Regions:
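N-terminal Rossmann-like FAD-binding beta1-loop-alpha1 element of flavoenzymes
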Residues: 3-33
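Phosphate-binding active sites in nucleotide-utilizing proteins
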Residues: 14, 40, 133, 147-152
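Residue-level detector of anion-binding/catalytic polar loops
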Residues: 30, 63, 138
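Active-site-adjacent segment of FAD-dependent monooxygenases/related oxidoreductases
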Residues: 42-133
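A conserved short coil-to-beta-strand element within the FAD-binding core of flavoproteins
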Residues: 141-158
């Protein structure tokens, strides 16, 4: 088993882990991200991306923000939650959502230079992971956290 030293160990390469890794690497902080699987998200998961998350992507660079928008459903196409008896049944009600109702559009427009959108995790996760690795994050797939011990010199983590 190899001994590897890093300033920060990030466990998980989902959106939070990969964004953390990308931001740390952007600031020159050595880090390693591990993922117990050998792949990134490949099944339906989270998909609504709020304005604050888009601001974090903008902090990573306009190229990252622009790539996210390229894969996302724009906010103005996310406007309704529809309630039906079934997929082909009678519509029971409709509610404007995701900041598209007339009374909330202005609030969203003035609160941030970014826009809420529908960006599935299957697109977001690879974008963040690619950004992190391209900026210096060391990544290890098929590595699972087992334990850690903290002492005066730091933290020793065992992965398998």
């Amino acid at each position: 088993m190899a001994d590897i030293t890093t300033d920060v160990l990030i466990i998980g390469t989902g959106p939070a882990g990969s964004a953390t890794a990308a931001l740390l690497s952007s600031y020159g902080i050595e880090n390693m991200a591990i993922n117990r699987y050998r792949w990134l998200a490949n099944t339906p998961r989270a998909h609504i991306t709020n304005q604050r998350t888009m601001e974090v992507l903008r902090d990573l660079g306009r190229d990252v923000e622009d790539e996210a928008y390229m894969h996302a459903t724009p906010n103005d196409l996310m406007g309704n939650n529809v309630f039906c008896e079934s997929l082909t049944g009678e519509e029971l009600g409709r509610m404007q959502s995701w900041g598209t109702a007339p009374h909330s559009v202005a609030e969203h427009l003035i609160s941030s230079p970014t826009r809420m959108n529908d960006l599935p995790q299957t697109f977001m996760e690879p974008l963040l992971f690619k950004t992190a690795c391209s900026r210096g994050t060391q990544a290890r797939m098929s590595c699972e956290y087992r334990s850690h011990v903290q002492d005066a010199d730091g933290v020793t983590t065992t992965v398998h």
